[in-house]
C-alpha cells in the first residue's frame, strides 16, 4: 500500500507546478451545507401558495426575477422544524434577534465543523498539526466568538492561534485567505485552517407580496461553509493546489452605503444598491492591473486571456459586466457561474466553492487529456461591503507544466 | 326485561360469535421498526447480491448495497426539499428496478407512498394527486406529460431531455448528498405513522385512498411470510410482473422478496418472449401471474421457441381472478412440477389475507378451488349481511377479517371508513365466502355483484366458471341487469376461442344444463375481450353499465 501511494504522489508531482519556497499554498479545500435544499424553479410556486396569492402578474414578475439570478439550487438552514420551534420568525415586527442568533450560532459552528473535517480529510494531515485558525463569518455575534466554538468542536489544541473576521460579508473568504497567507508565510511550518460559515437566518423575512424585491435577495443568497488548509513549503505527501503569491485589499471611497446592512431587533436588514454592478465594473480593471504588477517577471507579459479567473459570483450581473469590461471569453468564469448556479451567493464561502470547481476542472482536463490548457497564473477576487475589493494573484499548481522551449 | 338483562344478552351474543383463526401458531411482529428498516434489515451481508433486475435487454439492476444506499439518499433528498412526516408523494412509474427504491425512500423519509397507474388517464392521475394533497410526483417518460400540469413539482426518473421542467432524479440525489444535519432535528418516522396511501381499485364505487401504517405492512409481511424457510434466504427469485403501484406488487412481491434477500426480476408490460426469456435466464422460482399469462404459456406457439423443460419455476400464484378448470388442467399438464396457488387479499388489509402458500413442511395444501387458509395472527368470520350475525363453518356470509394489518381508514372519508371497519376492528370485505371443516376458505362473490333473480342470489363467478368449462369459451363475464319481472337477470359476455363456431344459443343451453333454473343466463353476447382491472379483476360494473346503455335506445 505504502509504495503504491508514494508512486501516485510522485507521478502527480511530476506533472504539476512546483511551488515557490516560502510562499503560502492552499493544500486542501472543503465544504459543507445545511439540510434544506431549495430548488429555484419551485420557489415561486411555493411562495405563491404560502402567501395565498394568485395574482398572475406578480407571479410572472417573480418568475422572471428568479430566473435572472441564474441560481438553480441553494442550501439553507431555515426549515419547517425551525419555523415550528420559532413561529415568531414568520411574523412581521417581532423582536427576534435573540432567537435568530441562537439558531445562527449553532448552525454556523455545525457547518464550519463539517467543512473543516472534510477539508482536513482531503489534506491527509491531522487536526493536531493545525497551528492557526482563521474563522470568517458575518452570521453570528457572541462572546466568546465562533472561532473558539469551532476550535473546541474540532478538538484543536488550546494553543492554536485564532483570528476571527466578522462582518466582512462577501469579500470575507478572500480576506481570510489573505490573513492565512500572512500567518503561513511569517511562521515557518505553520498549517493554517481557514473556515468560513454563513447563514441567512439572521436576515430571514417571511415572504410578502408587498415586497417582491425581497424575494430576489432571498432567491440569490445561500447558506453553507467552506474550509481551506494553508501552508508554505509543502511536504512530499502534501498536494498543493494554489500558490497565493500576492494579496491586496482596497476600498472604494464614498461607496459605504452601497452595501448596507443594519442589525435591528427584527434581524439584519440588507440593502444592496442597484448601482453595485456598475461600481464594480468601473473599478475592477485598475485593481486587477495592480495585482498583476505583483507578478515576479514582467507583468506586461500576462494578458487577461492567459489567466484563470476565480471570481466571487455576487450575482450574474457582476460576472457579465466583468466579462464585458475585461473582454474575457465565456469559459473564463465557468467555475464562478457553476458555483452561483449550484449554491447561490453563499457570501464568504463562495470563493471556496469557486476554487473547488477549478480544481475539479483541472482534474477533468487532465483525465480527458484535453487540448485546452490550464492557466498557471490567475486572480482570486471578491467584492464586499465598503465597497471592498479583495484580490490575490495566484498560481494553479495542478496545471500541467507547459512545454517551454 | 330489567336493566340487568342487557349485559347478559351481550355475553350471549359474544358466545355465539363464530371466529376462525389460523391453524398455524401466531408469529411475532417486531415493534418499533418501519417498513424500510424491516425490509432492508441485514442488507449489508448481501451488499453485492442483485436485489432487483429489469428483465428487458440492457435493463437496470440494483444490488442490495445500492438499494440501501439509494433508499437513504432519496429519503435524505425528500427531506432536503421539505418533505416531512405525513406528506404524500405520488409515484406514477411503470415497473422499474428503481421503483422499490423510490417507495422505500419515501417511507424512510417518514412520508407516504401513493402509487398510481402511469398508464391511467391524466385526469385520473390528477384526481389522485389532488385527493391525496400530494407534495410531489415521481414519474418517468411514460407518465410525465400527464403529471406535469398536476400542480406539484415532478421528479423525473430517466431521460431528462424528454421531461423538461422536471427535477432530475440524479441531480436531486447528488445535490442532496451535500446536505448536512438540521439545526432542529427532523421528526423520525414511527411504526404507527402512515407509510402508504394506495387507491383502492375502483371496481366498486369511487376510488379512495387507503391509509396504511408501517405497522400494517410489517405485520402483513410477518403473517404472509410465516412459512418462508430461513435457509432459503438470498436464494428466491421472484417475478415482478404484477404492477408495483398495486399494493400486492409493492408489498407482496417487492417488500417480501427484499426482506428475504432474494431477487425481483422486474417486468413492465407483458410480452410472452420477454417473459419466457426472463423465466429461463433469471431462473425465476416464484411467479405471481394473472390467468391470461398462464393461458399464453400453455397455448401460444411462441412458447415452443423456448426450452421450458429446465425451468427453476416452483410455483405460480393467481389472485383476484378465478382460474378456469381446463386452463388449470392444461397448465399442470405442461408444467407438472409447478404448483399453482391462489391467494386472496385486499388493499384495505395491507395485501395478502388468505393464501395457499405454506411452503414445504407445513403439511397443509389448501383445496384447489379455495383461496387458501387463514394466515397466522388473523381472525376471520363470516356474517349474514342482513342480520350482521356471524355464521358457522360451511355457511356463506360476508367475509370479515381483524388483524394488525387492517387499514387506518379511507383518507378523508370517515363515513366510508365506518361502514367498512366496524367499532370492534372488523374489516368488512364485501366478499361473500365460507370456510370449510378443514379451514379452507372459499370466496363466492362480491356482495354488490350478486345477482338477485326473483329473490334468489346468483353468484356471477359460479356462472363464469361454468362458461369457462365450455371448450369453445376463452373468457367470460357475468353480471346482472335490471328486469321488470325478475328484479335482475344474469347476462353473460363471452370471448369465443379462435375457430370455435358455437352460437350464443348453444352456449346458453350448455349453462342451462348445468345450473339451477333460476341461475340460467338469460342474455349472452359474443365479445372480443373482457375488460379487467390491472390486478385481473373483471370489471363487471363497467360491463353492466355499458350493457344497459346499449339496451336503452331499443327499449
Swiss-Prot record, chain A:
It is found in: Endoplasmic reticulum. InterPro entries: Chalcone/stilbene_synt_C, Chalcone/stilbene_synt_N, Polyketide_synthase_type-III, Thiolase-like. Disruption phenotype: Defective pollen exine and Ubisch bodies patterning, shrunken and aborted pollen grains, and male sterility. Male sterility and defective pollen walls. Altered composition of lipidic and phenolic compounds in anthers. No significant reduction in sporopollenin accumulation. GO terms for cellular component: endoplasmic reticulum. SUPFAM superfamilies: Thiolase-like (SSF53901). Plant type III polyketide synthases (PKSs) that catalyzes the condensation of fatty acyl-CoA with malonyl-CoA to generate triketide and tetraketide alpha-pyrones, the main components of pollen exine and potential sporopollenin precursors. May be involved in the synthesis of sporopollenin precursors in tapetal cells to regulate pollen wall formation. Required for exine and Ubisch body formation in anthers. Does not possess chalcone synthase (CHS) activity in vitro with the substrates 4-coumaroyl-CoA and malonyl-CoA. Interacts with STS1. This is Type III polyketide synthase 10. The gene is PKS10.
Swiss-Prot record, chain B:
GO terms for cellular component: endoplasmic reticulum. It is an enzyme of class 6 (ligase). It catalyses: (E)-4-coumarate + ATP + CoA = (E)-4-coumaroyl-CoA + AMP + diphosphate; (E)-4-coumarate + ATP + H(+) = (E)-4-coumaroyl-AMP + diphosphate; (E)-4-coumaroyl-AMP + CoA = (E)-4-coumaroyl-CoA + AMP + H(+). Its EC number is 6.2.1.12. Residues 343-410 are annotated as: SBD2. GO terms for molecular function: 4-coumarate-CoA ligase activity; ATP binding; long-chain fatty acid-CoA ligase activity; medium-chain fatty acid-CoA ligase activity; trans-cinnamate-CoA ligase activity. Residues 271-342 are annotated as: SBD1. Keywords: ATP-binding, Ligase, Magnesium, Nucleotide-binding. Coiled coil: none annotated. Both substrate-binding domains (SBD1 and SBD2) are involved in the substrate recognition, and are sufficient to confer the substrate specificity. This is 4-coumarate--CoA ligase-like 9.
